[in-house]
A protein has these predicted regions:
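Catalytic core of the metallo-beta-lactamase
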Residues: 105-111, 208-268, 284, 291-292
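Metallo-beta-lactamase
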Residues: 1-128, 132-134, 140-146, 181-251, 326-330, ...
Length: 330
């Protein structure tokens, strides 16, 4: 019994020490926490979706679902070859050219009317463990040092595949402003970013950047958390309005009424960036199934749709290229 208790104590201490690493960030505090408490989207100690959103829908429970994900046979959820990719010299791009460069999964660079926007950059392993959630072979072409100067860094939520400590800290001195959902700014402040350059938004809020540029924070149907405790920070979608463009950044999340709401508020969207991958019937409300994607595209009515959240990490059991085939069939 003494040996068992000693081993258990050592294990608990090791986990606590591991989770005290800076990558995990820290919980919101002070004035930021008081603002969170005042949010209409925060109730009973956690942020809430607009509609009831169970994270798991299989009825199997969290541990059984995780066991299936880790050990159930998966058909082609990772490619068996290096994926072909083109590496663009981002620093040589004409800053006046309107364009989007995708880095795989949910990381991409947008240039719109001279504004450089970097969204959810993750150029390393999408987990705190170096051997877990590694990128597919051939998809890790870009590194933080390849990025040009960034005017606006947008983070949609704090999950490991969207917010990476190693990436953003290496970009800190080349980033003009960070825009993120309420509570996520705590990570950036903890990681050494100037608080004056951090803009946190709740759903329904907006930030004028000057020069005809505005960022609007709107709902998403998802959840948050980098530790065992979920939903202490908000998750969101964003609309970036430039002098000539309206761009929807969907972030992560399941289908809901917010897509139609965004379309009514921002008609004639030029581009909608939508998640298309890492879905499962086991968590159908927090990631869109293929039929949900089709409905979201129709609800938004954007002139162009760019599907992301695929082709770099295996976070679900579906074949790795199925999301691409689904998008091509729209």
């Amino acid at each position: 019994m003494i040996v068992f208790l000693a081993v258990a104590a050592l294990l608990v201490a090791a986990i606590a020490l591991f989770m005290n690493r800076p990558e995990f960030g820290r919980a919101p505090r002070g004035e930021r926490l008081e603002r969170i408490w005042r949010s209409p989207n925060y109730r009973d100690g956690a942020f809430r979706n607009r509609h009831a959103t169970p994270q798991l829908t299989s009825g199997k429970g969290w541990w059984a679902t995780m066991y299936d994900f880790l050990f159930e046979r998966k058909e082609r959820n990772r490619p068996d070859h290096a994926l072909p990719a083109v590496k663009t010299d981002l620093k040589a791009l004409d800053p006046k050219e309107n364009l989007l460069v995708w880095f795989g999964h949910s990381s991409y660079l947008i240039q719109a009317d001279g504004l450089r926007i970097l969204v959810d950059p993750v150029f390393e392993t999408a987990s705190p463990l170096p051997f877990f959630n590694r990128p597919f072979e051939g998809t890790d072409l870009y590194k933080p040092e390849d990025m040009p100067g960034i005017d606006l860094l947008v983070i949609t939520h704090d999950h490991w595949d969207h917010l990476d400590y190693g990436t953003v800290t290496k970009l800190r001195d080349r980033t003009g402003r960070v825009v993120c959902p309420l509570g996520v700014g705590e990570y950036f402040e903890y990681w050494g970013f100037d608080p004056q350059r951090i803009t946190e938004l709740d759903w329904g809020e907006q930030a004028a950047l000057g020069g005809g540029f505005t960022v609007y924070c709107r709902p998403a149907r998802h959840f948050s958390g980098r530790t065992f405790r979920a939903n202490r920070t908000l998750w969101a979608s964003f609309v970036v309005e430039t002098p000539s463009q309206r761009i929807f950044l969907g972030g992560d999340g399941g289908d809901d009424t917010h897509f139609a709401d965004v379309a009514r508020e921002f008609p004639n969207l030029d581009v909608a960036v939508l998640e298309d991958g890492q879905y499962s019937e086991d968590w159908r409300y927090i990631h869109m199934l293929p039929a949900d994607l089709k409905r979201a595209v129709e609800d938004l009515g954007a002139r162009r749709v760019f599907p992301v959240h695929n082709s770099k990490y295996a976070l679900a059991r579906h074949p790795w290229d199925e999301p691409l085939n689904n998008a091509a069939a729209l």
